């Protein structure tokens, strides 16, 4: 875990709690995404690394962000600038969306298959995982031809390996025992 992630977590939590209270999760997600993109811009990155005062940094950052931020979002920028944390915006954004997904009972699921899955297969996998995990599932599918056949599903700490490669490995281990 990076230092910026540790630094970002309390800011993300504060922004998340505020957004939940105001019923503005999507708006705050958009503001933080924009701020993360701004903070990652090379010119802005160099500016943030400079010797400007916190007040001036906040002012410049707010001008760059323009109408994207409401007064509460601008307050977050000011607080982060005062604490020298504007560089942490990408991590704040990442942590905010982790909290948002947890709050909305959503989970990203990585599905790796030997061949491209049909829409029916994706729908079936999604449906079964939603039942098992009691969450809305967002599938991210990829292809790995070395699997031969089958799928590997990763959802958080859960890994379901139903690939031909893993079955062959288990058979090989059983035969060698």
UniProtKB/Swiss-Prot annotation:
It is a peripheral membrane protein. It comes from the Bacteria. PANTHER family: ATP SYNTHASE DELTA CHAIN. Belongs to the ATPase delta chain family. F(1)F(0) ATP synthase produces ATP from ADP in the presence of a proton or sodium gradient. F-type ATPases consist of two structural domains, F(1) containing the extramembraneous catalytic core and F(0) containing the membrane proton channel, linked together by a central stalk and a peripheral stalk. During catalysis, ATP synthesis in the catalytic domain of F(1) is coupled via a rotary mechanism of the central stalk subunits to proton translocation. This is ATP synthase subunit delta 1. One of its GO terms (cellular component) is plasma membrane. InterPro entries: ATP_synth_OSCP/delta_N_sf, ATPase_OSCP/d_CS, ATPase_OSCP/dsu. F-type ATPases have 2 components, F(1) - the catalytic core - and F(0) - the membrane proton channel. F(1) has five subunits: alpha(3), beta(3), gamma(1), delta(1), epsilon(1). F(0) has three main subunits: a(1), b(2) and c(10-14). The alpha and beta chains form an alternating ring which encloses part of the gamma chain. F(1) is attached to F(0) by a central stalk formed by the gamma and epsilon chains, while a peripheral stalk is formed by the delta and b chains. HAMAP family: ATP_synth_delta_bact. It is found in: Cell inner membrane. Keywords: ATP synthesis, Cell inner membrane, Cell membrane, CF(1), Hydrogen ion transport, Ion transport, Membrane, Transport. One of its GO terms (molecular function) is proton-transporting ATP synthase activity, rotational mechanism.
């Amino acid at each position: 875990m990076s230092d910026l992630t540790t630094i970002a977590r309390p800011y993300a939590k504060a922004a998340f709690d505020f957004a939940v209270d105001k019923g503005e999760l999507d708006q705050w997600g958009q503001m933080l995404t924009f701020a993360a993109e701004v903070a990652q811009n090379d010119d802005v990155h160099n500016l943030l690394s400079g010797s400007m005062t916190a007040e001036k940094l906040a002012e410049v950052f707010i001008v760059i962000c323009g109408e994207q931020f409401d007064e509460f979002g601008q307050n977050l920028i000011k607080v982060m600038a005062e604490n020298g944390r504007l560089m942490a915006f990408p991590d704040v954004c990442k942590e905010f969306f982790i909290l948002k997904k947890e709050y909305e009972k959503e989970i990203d699921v990585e599905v790796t298959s030997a061949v491209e899955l049909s829409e029916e297969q994706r729908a079936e996998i999604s449906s079964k995982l939603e039942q098992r995990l009691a969450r809305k599932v967002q599938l991210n599918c990829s292809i790995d031809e070395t699997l031969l056949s089958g799928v590997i599903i990763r959802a958080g700490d859960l890994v379901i390996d139903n690939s031909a490669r893993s079955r062959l490995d288990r058979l090989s281990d059983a035969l060698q025992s």
